[in-house]
Curated annotation (Swiss-Prot):
Pathway assignment: Amino-acid biosynthesis; L-tryptophan biosynthesis; L-tryptophan from chorismate: step 5/5
PANTHER family named in the record: TRYPTOPHAN SYNTHASE ALPHA CHAIN, CHLOROPLASTIC (PTHR43406:SF1), TRYPTOPHAN SYNTHASE, ALPHA CHAIN (PTHR43406)
Protein name from the UniProt record: Tryptophan synthase alpha chain
CDD domains the record matches: Tryptophan_synthase_alpha (cd04724)
Organism: Chlorobium luteolum (strain DSM 273 / BCRC 81028 / 2530) (Pelodictyon luteolum)
Function according to Swiss-Prot or TrEMBL: The alpha subunit is responsible for the aldol cleavage of indoleglycerol phosphate to indole and glyceraldehyde 3-phosphate.
Active site: 50 (proton acceptor), 61 (proton acceptor)
Catalytic activity, EC: 4.2.1.20
Gene Ontology CC terms: cytosol
Swiss-Prot/TrEMBL catalytic activity: (1S,2R)-1-C-(indol-3-yl)glycerol 3-phosphate + L-serine = D-glyceraldehyde 3-phosphate + L-tryptophan + H2O
InterPro entries in alphabetical order: Aldolase_TIM (IPR013785), RibuloseP-bd_barrel (IPR011060), Trp_synthase_alpha_AS (IPR018204), Trp_synthase_suA (IPR002028)
Family: Belongs to the TrpA family.
Length: 270
């Protein structure tokens, strides 16, 4: 019997070091940007890349990611075309082969429209490593997410500052490899972590998560620069940067310039 290949996210987390995760919306800011940007992020040292699944009504996202999603849709991104981009990235078609773990993050509506089981099988076939679906709570999605796990996909759940200790422990037990902590209760990109009282509150919250979580956890929302990354590394196992990356590449006139800006920004975080 052929031994099942280890999930790339699982393997990455076994390296036992602090992680830097990139969030990128495909085909932003211009069509054709995805593969060059993925290559630039990989070369720049991204440990895991979260690819956004664009949706027309992303209620949990701030204006930067909402705008990026609308541009992605305008540039023809669908669930099917996104999976094809992942397949090309893994095969090295149009770029150097992308080996960094890839996590898809998006709302449930496009996945339901695609067909839940079909999506899971096609995602695995394309080379996706994991899923984070913010509007699909574990209480309402046990069967779907169990099927995802059975196919070897990492399933990531959210923890927020208002999550009680007993639920932190439960979410931690459900997450395959790690949980995703929202730094504050806000839409993406709108959080401000520089205020001393806010920073102290976030610190206490992450210390509480550390007390109740047995698995690793990363933190996102409002992380914009190297100083914030280093601060979060002291409290969590990884930091996620998304809105600031999208802001840095916004307005690039072509895929090459988008990739150059992405690489420049990401190297500055490292």
């Amino acid at each position: 019997m052929t031994q099942k290949k280890e999930n790339r996210i699982t393997a990455r987390l076994r390296e036992d070091r602090k992680l830097l995760l990139a969030y990128y919306m495909p085909e932003f800011p211009v069509a054709g940007s995805t593969l060059p940007v993925l290559e630039a992020l990989q070369d720049g040292g991204a440990d895991i890349i979260e690819l956004g699944i664009p949706f027309s009504d992303p209620v949990g996202d701030g204006p930067v990611i909402q705008n990026a999603a609308h541009i992605a849709i305008r540039n023809g991104v669908s669930v099917r075309s996104l999976l094809e981009l992942v397949r090309k990235a893994r095969a090295g078609e149009g770029c150097r082969k992308i080996t960094v773990p890839i996590l898809l993050m998006g709302y449930s509506n496009p996945l339901i429209a695609y067909g839940g089981d079909c999506f899971l099988h096609d995602a695995v076939k394309a080379g996706v490593d994991g899923l984070l679906i913010p509007d699909l709570p574990p209480e309402e999605s046990a069967d779907f997410l169990q099927r995802a796990k059975s196919l070897g996909l990492t399933v990531v759940y959210l923890i927020s500052p208002v999550t009680p200790p007993e639920r932190i422990e439960w979410i931690d037990s459900l997450s395959t490899d790690f949980s995703y902590c929202l730094a504050v209760n806000a839409t993406t990109g709108t959080a401000k972590l520089a205020d001393a009282s806010t920073e102290a509150s976030v610190d206490r919250y992450l210390e509480r998560v550390r007390l109740h979580a047995r698995k690793k956890f990363v933190v996102g929302f409002g992380i914009r620069d190297r100083a914030r990354v280093e601060h979060m590394w002291r409290l969590a196992d990884g930091a996620v940067v998304g809105t600031a990356l999208l802001e840095h590449i916004a307005g690039a006139p072509n895929p090459g310039e988008a990739a150059r800006r992405a690489g420049e920004f990401w190297r500055g975080l490292r």
